[in-house]
Amino acid sequence: MNRKKILIIDDDPSFLEICSAILEESDYQVDTASSSKEGLEKLVSQRPDLLLLDIMMATMDEGLNFATSMRQSKDLSKIPIMIVSAQPDAEKGYQRSVDKEMDWISADMFMEKPINPQDLLHNVRLLIE
């Protein structure tokens, strides 16, 4: 069976390590990137089955801008995006920005950090299996 590929883009090394371990233990092929620049290079070269994206990295809008660019790309727009954030109420703020400009950005799922391993695996399965 072909292992599903997941790319995680987050500027928190401990989150990358923990999340990777959870997913690899469930037989997913995982790669990580600590910046949107590195993430874009891996996204284009590897074409993962799922992207886990921190919405707020080095700058406030880095994750949102990354998702926006991805959704505007013909080649990358079909890859599911799971947004993750440690910011309280980030989901509400994200939803407001999506509601305003629904035509050009969307994520397939949102999860708040800290991530519950069982919830993460459940949501990953919903998106790619």
Where are these regions (language model features)?
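Alpha4 helix (beta4-alpha4-beta5 surface) of REC/receiver domains from two-component response regulators
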Residues: 61-65, 87-111, 118, 122
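His-Asp phosphorelay/catalytic-motif detector in bacterial-type signaling
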Residues: 47-49, 75-80
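Acidic catalytic/metal-coordinating carboxylates
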Residues: 14, 34-38, 61-68
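Active-site residues of response regulator receiver
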Residues: 54-55, 85
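Acidic, metal-coordinating helix/loop segments flanking the phosphotransfer/catalytic sites
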Residues: 32-50
